[in-house]
Structure formats: C-alpha cells, structure tokens
C-alpha cells in the first residue's frame, strides 16, 4: 500500500495530486492512502455551486480569510483552517456500481478506531444542523462552558471512478470556534440550517491538539497492518 505524506505547494496542485493518485490506483491496482493538513480554504461541494446564494457564500468565506474552492465530491461546504486533517483511502475496484455502502460503513469504523486510539469516545452520528450533514459522520462528547455535549468531529464522502474508489473525509483537530464563525454566514447564504455549536474538535473531545498525531492515527487505521511504501509530496513547509 502506498502511503502519501505531505501536501503540494498550492491548493490547486494539492487537489490535482489526489486526482492523479486515484487514477494511479485504478491503473496499478495498488491501494493508497493520504492523511494530511490541506491549505487554509473553504471547500464547497457541487450542490453548493447550484444554490442561488453561492456567490454570496464565497464572498463571506473570502472576507474571513478562507479562499473559496470547489471540490469534486458531494456534500456541503467544509472549512480547513490549516490544522484540519483530511484523509483519503483509495482502493482498486472491479465494479464501480457495487460496494458503496460497505465502503462508507467501513470508513466510519476506521475513523472511530483512529479517534479511539487518541483517547476519544467517538461514535457514528452527528448533532442536528451540523456542517456537511450526512449519514456517515462521527461525533464525540466535547467540552463546553456548561459541561459536555455531542459535537461533530468528522464527515465522510466517496468518489468512484472506473477501476478505483476513494473514501475521503475531514477531521477537525482544533479551531472549532473559527470554523463555526466562517460556516455560519456561508451556510446562511446557501440556505442550509447550521448550528455553530455543532462543530467539535479532537482537542475539545479530550484528544491531542496536534494535527500530525491525528493524521498518523488515521493513516495507521486505514493501513491496518498492510505492508507500505512511504512517499512525500513536494511542500517542504509542512510535514503532515
């Protein structure tokens, strides 16, 4: 299994690297994994781009220091602060029409196992009006001024092409207030219900405030003991 670490020098180049990796998995039949911290950005899903308030939402993101981009998978807008960890598990598939649900279910279990290894009591689910709402999300009790409440830590998406499937997602490590602050006007412009208090983080759930540790935990859970070769992308300014 190929383990790809680091990120490319620009957001566009970084997204291109993942697309190229998906094609390489389809061509070679060798699975691959990435777990890294993307550049600071606000990534909109394809549904967002069709909303009447899309340009207003892009402006709100830009005003708050989050360059807006569009991602190829579905789902709603996601904010990356620079400490947010993304992951992508890429596997060859013989039939692109089957296995979708099984891959989603397995991915939830993998994220829960990774968070468990970091001391977090995570489970499948999400509180109401969460960011990027979906059936395959992970939540955990997070510290608040009034005690603890379940908050969303991770969301999962999937893309399938001829010969390969990519299950990807995002895990909020820290900066939950900043994420809530930028997503609030963005989701409002898109007409999507959103509660900023639904945003959790690994740190608020009692785990490490360290994106490198979170990335390696996700990587280890996805690899699951398989033999690996480690490769690095080109941005020397970031290890993860």
Regions found by a protein language model. Give the residues of each.
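Acidic, polar-rich N-terminal leader regions of halophilic archaeal proteins
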Residues: 1-240
């Amino acid at each position: 299994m190929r383990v790809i670490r680091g990120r490319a020098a620009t957001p566009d180049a970084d997204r291109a690297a993942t697309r190229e990796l998906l094609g390489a998995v389809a061509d070679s039949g060798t699975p691959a994994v990435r777990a890294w911290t993307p550049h600071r950005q606000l990534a909109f899903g394809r549904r967002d781009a069709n909303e009447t308030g899309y340009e207003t939402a892009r402006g709100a993101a830009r005003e708050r220091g989050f360059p807006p981009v569009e991602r190829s998978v579905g789902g709603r807008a996601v904010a990356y602060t620079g400490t947010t960890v993304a992951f992508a598990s890429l596997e060859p598939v013989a039939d692109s029409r089957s296995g979708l649900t099984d891959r989603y279910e397995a991915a939830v279990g993998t994220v829960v196992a990774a968070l468990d290894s970091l001391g977090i009591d995570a489970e499948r689910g999400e509180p109401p009006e969460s960011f990027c709402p979906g059936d395959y999300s992970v939540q955990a009790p997070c510290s608040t001024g009034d005690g603890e409440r379940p908050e969303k830590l991770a969301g999962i998406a999937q893309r399938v092409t001829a010969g390969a499937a990519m299950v990807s997602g995002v895990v909020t490590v820290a900066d939950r207030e900043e994420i809530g602050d930028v997503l609030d006007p963005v989701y409002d412009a898109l007409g999507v219900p959103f509660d900023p208090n639904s945003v959790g983080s690994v740190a608020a759930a009692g785990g490490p405030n360290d994106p490198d540790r979170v990335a390696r935990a996700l990587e280890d859970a996805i690899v699951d003991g398989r033999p690996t070769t480690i490769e690095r992308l080109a941005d020397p300014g970031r290890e993860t």
